[in-house]
């Protein structure tokens, strides 16, 4: 085995937003650099600068290639493809140059645009893919609205990914369910996301507040949550719901009007860095997602002593929540039962406390020290 102070390069689109992948990459990069003493570089393609939304150690270097694939989102399909191929060619050239310059021991990709060519870069590094989405949502296209040629293109593209994943030295997924999603692959390892908080206290569970944290998107299910809350607020007239999320809340404001939801007790906020503070000011965490690669928000809330309610969607929640023990799992997408579970927790401080204590114990499995050790063992194994 080589000197175990490895050079690690992370390839991920961006660090500037408040997404789960950005949070996890930042936490692990900090641990690898500050605790394990690795030489860590993160290479991004998006954002005007390399600034991270989440805290990033001074020991972690960031290289921004400035390709800005995100500017293609509003282009027509044909123009998008032509410009994408041009940017992709430049990305391959720039990333190859950086990897040949850095000569990392290990290159980790979050399986975005570089997965199409990263195995062909002969820089001598081991290549690890890190999958943060369920298979059904990896490179998903909404077939309800897409033209037939777009559907064909994306399905063809998606199938080609399997070959690229097979060539990786290792593919890391977040749950055991996710392992079973990829029967074609024999190079899989399960390592969960790490808890990103250093929690020093626990919620008193006395505030009359339900909280959720995520992204204003279809996958996160806030349209469903508002329908659920329209039931809850009628029975629990002194409780409030606070949603902290990145993205545009405008469609949800309209939905609140349509459902006659009391805006004095249901608040749509932008994303926050200090999520621990919001957990500690709350008494229940809800996660109404249609799909989750893992469910880091659940672990964070549990670490702060909150009972949690989540749909039993693929893939993450069932690996974290034991229904009726440290939280509630609700069959997708049973709005009435979800509302009843919230009301049940609102009605009993003892139940909130019992579930919160069990959840807090469960969250210890995801401490960065534990997860980081699993990554270290993987690195050592690959570098033998």
Please identify what each model-predicted range represents.
Residues 19-27, 208, 212-231, 250, ...:
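A conserved mid-protein helix/loop that constitutes part of the nucleotide-sugar donor-binding site
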Residues 42-50, 213, 240-253:
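Glycosyltransferase donor-sugar binding loop
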Residues 93-98, 135, 150-170:
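Membrane-proximal helix-turn-helix segments that form the acceptor-binding/catalytic region
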Residues 106-108, 121-141, 151, 172:
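Active-site proximal beta-strand in glycosyltransferases
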Residues 177, 194:
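Carbohydrate-associated surface elements
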Residues 271, 290:
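Aromatic "clamp/platform" in nucleotide-sugar-dependent glycosyltransferases that forms part
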Residues 307-311:
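Short hydrophobic beta-strand element within catalytic cores of glycosyltransferases
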Residues 322-324, 328-335, 344-350, 364:
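Conserved acidic donor-binding segment of nucleotide-sugar-dependent glycosyltransferases
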């Amino acid at each position: 085995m080589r000197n175990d102070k490895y050079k690690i390069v992370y390839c991920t689109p961006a660090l500037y937003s408040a997404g789960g992948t950005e949070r996890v990459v930042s936490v692990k990069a900090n641990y690898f650099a500050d605790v394990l003493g690795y030489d860590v570089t993160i290479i991004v393609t998006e954002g005007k600068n390399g600034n991270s939304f989440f805290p990033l150690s001074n020991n972690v270097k960031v290289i921004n290639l400035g390709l800005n694939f995100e500017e293609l989102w509003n282009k027509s399909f044909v123009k998008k493809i032509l410009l994408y191929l041009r940017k992709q060619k430049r990305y391959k050239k720039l990333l190859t140059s950086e990897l040949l310059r850095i000569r990392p021991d290990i290159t980790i990709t979050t399986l975005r645009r570089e997965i199409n060519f990263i195995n062909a870069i002969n820089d001598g590094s081991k290549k690890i893919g890190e999958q943060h989405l369920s298979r059904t949502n990896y490179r998903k296209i909404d077939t309800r609205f897409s033209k037939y040629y777009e559907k064909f293109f994306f399905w063809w593209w998606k199938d080609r990914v399997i070959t690229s994943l097979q060539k990786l030295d290792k593919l890391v997924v977040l749950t055991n369910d996710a392992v079973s999603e990829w029967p074609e692959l024999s190079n899989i390892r399960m390592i969960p996301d790490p808890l990103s908080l250093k929690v020093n206290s626990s919620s008193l569970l006395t505030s009359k507040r339900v909280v959720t944290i995520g992204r204003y998107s279809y996958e996160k299910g806030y349209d469903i949550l508002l329908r659920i809350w329209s039931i809850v607020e009628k029975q629990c007239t002194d409780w409030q719901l606070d949603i902290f999320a990145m993205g545009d809340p405008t469609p949800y404001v309209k939905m609140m009007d349509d459902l006659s939801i009391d805006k004095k007790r249901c608040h749509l906020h932008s994303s926050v860095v200090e999520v621990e503070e919001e957990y500690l000011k709350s008494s229940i965490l809800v996660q109404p997602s249609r799909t989750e690669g893992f469910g880091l928000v659940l672990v964070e809330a549990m670490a702060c002593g909150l009972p949690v309610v989540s749909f039993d969607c693929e893939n993450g929640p069932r690996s974290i929540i034991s229904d009726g023990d440290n939280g509630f799992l609700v069959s997708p997408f049973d709005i009435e039962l979800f509302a009843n579970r919230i009301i049940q927790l609102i009605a009993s401080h003892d139940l909130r406390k019992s579930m919160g204590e069990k959840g807090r114990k469960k969250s210890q499995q995801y401490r960065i020290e534990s997860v980081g050790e699993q990554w270290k063992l993987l690195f050592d194994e690959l570098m033998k």
